[in-house]
């Protein structure tokens, strides 16, 4: 999860989009060249963001539900008013069910599923999690980012 202050959204989107090649709609770290990854991470390190990386042992679908429940708890108790999730049609319905249950009626914010070409801010958690999972020098590039590792148990 990456938290961006509303007043920084436009500036951060602009910083990220400058890394797009002509005709490219989004940045996905798995597909990028190393020099692009380095430049994007260097820019992310300059951004005023907060990131949380949730770690779970479960497999994808179950892990996603566990992570969403934890994220919902953070949202419910915090000041965040908008949640944007990467749109994966196979899990959207499940995501909505988990969020409705975990957020309850008291949260006044909104949430939506968007594709990464629709919302550049979705590139932030992709880049950060890719670097963390890659380890070594890539993980070291995250040292200037306000990053909290959150271990989750079932």
Spans of features found by a protein language model:
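Phosphate-ester processing/binding pockets and catalytic centers
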Residues: 2-154
